[in-house]
Amino acid sequence: MFLTNEKIRQLTVGAAAIYEEAEGLRFTKCTADQLAAWKEAAPWIYANAVGSTGVRLDFCTDSDFVTVKTAEYGKYEVKINGLLHAQYAFREADGNDRINSFTVHPGEGVNRITVSLPSHGPAGIISSVEVADGSFCERHRFDTKMLFLGDSITQGWNTKYDSMSYAYLVSEAFNADSIIQGIGGAIFAPSTVLPMDFAPDTVVVAYGTNDWGYYSDYTTYRNAVHDTLAKVNELYGSAKIYVISPIWRQDCGKTTKVGTFDDCCNTVRDMAALFGMTLIDGDTLVPPIMDYMADAVHPNDLGFAVYAANVIKAMK
């Protein structure tokens, strides 16, 4: 039997907005207002803001198969009972059609199925979900809610498996219903911190590495950090708020118009303290060794595993 669009909505986690289109349901990590704000604040970032990072279907079922039909390119990953089972990568360059489908067979009994939509590129579209006739599907039950605000590192750039980014791994460790608004190229931009229909118990803010090369002077950067955290505090003051300072990068020895990389990181530390937010020091998260990095800025899968483990330890 095919699940209705309403049922698919009920099983969805991590979507700030869901749009019903001719090809199916399109899921985005940002609301329409947030997308408009990013387009105004930093137009070059907009393409990275429209995606479906962190969006997944997460449900328990007694069906012996689950078939998902998609209508967009990208990587779709499936976990069965929390363990990565398969990745289905559909790329136009490989000659794939935009319409694709995949089937998983979880085995007998009740199993938890997690289908992660693409973290990069266009927002994922689910055209249909089919399960065995007469089977049940219930949304996974979570213990808490988390919101991640950050740049490409929070988005999980250069991971081989999207669902192995630190934000995904931290969400899983705390059994969290989470929205992951990781946006490649993102900076501290107060105008983009806007309300949405999601009340997190925990908020994680992780910007700064792009700001170091973006802002024209230190004062402008400092004000952006201050004003962004002020907005986060205004909207989510009742939540536990963590601020992650930038992690090591290969070119951290240079000086930009903002100042040294230490100046950049120390400002984040100081502003977090000003608002009474809990700092997670980026220097303690990933070894300053290129074996843990996919490039000069982003961790690889190994680096993200270590990053996540250290964030989890800091939160506990």
Locations of regions flagged by a protein language model:
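Conserved SGNH/GDSL esterase-like catalytic core that processes O-acyl groups on lipids
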Residues: 142-227, 250-254, 259-266, 294, ...
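Hydrophobic/aromatic beta-strand patches that form the interior of the parallel beta-sheet core
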Residues: 147, 179, 242, 278-280
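Alpha/beta-hydrolase-fold catalytic nucleophile elbow
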Residues: 206, 244-245
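A short helix->loop->beta-strand "cap" motif at the edges of active sites that frequently abuts
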Residues: 236-240
